[in-house]
Amino acid sequence: MVPKLALIYTGGPNRELGQGWALGGVSKIERCAATKAVDGVPGSVQYKNSDKLCLDGQRLIQVDSAGVPLAFPQSGDAAAVASGSYREYRPERDSLTRVRAYGGSGSYGPAYFMVWSADGRLTEYGDSPGAATDAKARHLASGVGVSWAVSRAADSSGNFIQYLYSNYWGYSFTAAYEWTLDEVRYTGTAGQAPSNKLVLTGEGVRSCKCKVNRCSP
């Protein structure tokens, strides 16, 4: 397995990759708002157990042990999960992908997620058992889990990739940590650590002063 990263122009603010650029190919699960189409009533992210969850922008729907969606409106989507148990979901438009939440405490949300794809891949998000000890893949706002970035991905043959991040004080949420991808370790196999790695480095964010439709350093 090899990482598949890409530079994407979003037109957004000045960030680590420069004005308007973002890094693609980094999967994540994050809190998202309820919608009228799915939940009957639109909502907003409140950083509570009642928040909804999305995998790469696609809504996760709670299901029972047979994979049947629970009755709507669903509750506790973003709640922590008791030790030895899990909560199961399906992506809204992909019934063949199985998502489970594990761990966590109080109202802080799950500790990690495991995602099984139809092609045999197992992808882990957050502070999962297979994550590198310094992965920092669960991102918090005042202790509450805000997003869970991919920490490990493995194929059906046991080949795997690990992802490591930096957390820093940001501006997206009240008292929140933001994150950047620092390193990708790949060519790992069952019983053998990855022998190759991709390290992302930068010279800092270049700021600019904008006037009408032009910028100057």
What does each of the following model-derived ranges do?
Residues M1-P217:
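Conserved catalytic cores of ATP-dependent inositol ring kinases
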